[in-house]
Amino acid sequence: MGKDLNTLINRSGSRMAMRFVLVTRNRGKAEEFSQIFKEYGFNFRVEPMAAPEIQADDLREIARYSVLYAYKVLREPVLVEDAGLFIKALNGFPGPYSSYVYETIGVEGILKLMEGVVRRDARFESALAFYSPLTELKIFTGAVEGRISEEPRGRGGFGFDPIFIPDGSVKTFAEMSLEEKNRFSHRARAARKFAEWFKTLKTLPPIYQD
């Protein structure tokens, strides 16, 4: 996945000056970040490395642990994200355990838990962690309020996208184009906060990909 995705992200030249490494095995997530970072003219590469996730109730702590682990392995400026779906009627479940819950009970399992629930308020959150030895560890967060749909809708996106409708839209994330989703999503909001900060840096040297 990494090679194909890096070809998609960086089309010009075999030796590109890179500024950071995005660590993720999720192609959809990488494509969402890619579209936003291209708006800022950032060059980066994707590393499909499995960064371990600690069991914690705070997305920021999970992202913090993962980014430091990734840096120890790669020794390059690294960016790692953790995200979660927080459903009010389920007391914030699945929250920071969203990936595990999706893999075990999936979208249908969440809808089953929500059977008969009228108030379907939910929130997607993102914690985006960056680390370089020339900067302190930084975490950027983003959130979007919305609601859980009555049934899965759409074929785009990934994870719980087919059942989440952000406020201000009648579509689920899975029914949106990439451009539409990036106008609403928690991930896009965190990414833009990071990008606004990162573009001001003067001290990071480029790294290179052959």
Annotate the PLM regions.
Residues T7, T24-N26:
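Short helix-onset patch at the extreme N-terminus, typifying the N->h transition
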Residues A17-V21, G28-D210:
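Anionic-ligand binding patches
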